[in-house]
A protein has these predicted regions:
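Short, basic, alpha-helical segments at the C-terminal edge of helix-turn-helix-like DNA-binding modules
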Residues: 60-61
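Basic, helix-initiating cap at the start of DNA-binding domains
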Residues: 1-23, 28-38, 52-56
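Short hydrophobic/aromatic patch on the recognition helix
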Residues: 39-48
Length: 61
């Protein structure tokens, strides 16, 4: 994985962790995650495939 990919994935995970902690899974949209991580939805889909996979990765950290 390149440094840019690692950075993007980490930014998404950091944003998701913060938002899930603050608003819960149901109260957090992927749009909020992408906005906070400064990425587009395609990056989330590329790295995680779904919101469920994203939250699972947050828990694995």
């Amino acid at each position: 994985m390149s440094k840019a990919q690692f950075s993007t994935k980490e930014r998404i995970l950091d944003a998701a962790e913060t938002l899930f902690a603050q608003y819960g899974f149901g109260g957090t949209s992927l749009r909020q995650v992408t906005s906070q991580a400064d990425v587009n939805i395609a990056a989330v889909n590329y790295h995680f495939g779904s919101k469920e996979n994203l939250v699972n990765e947050v828990f694995r950290r």
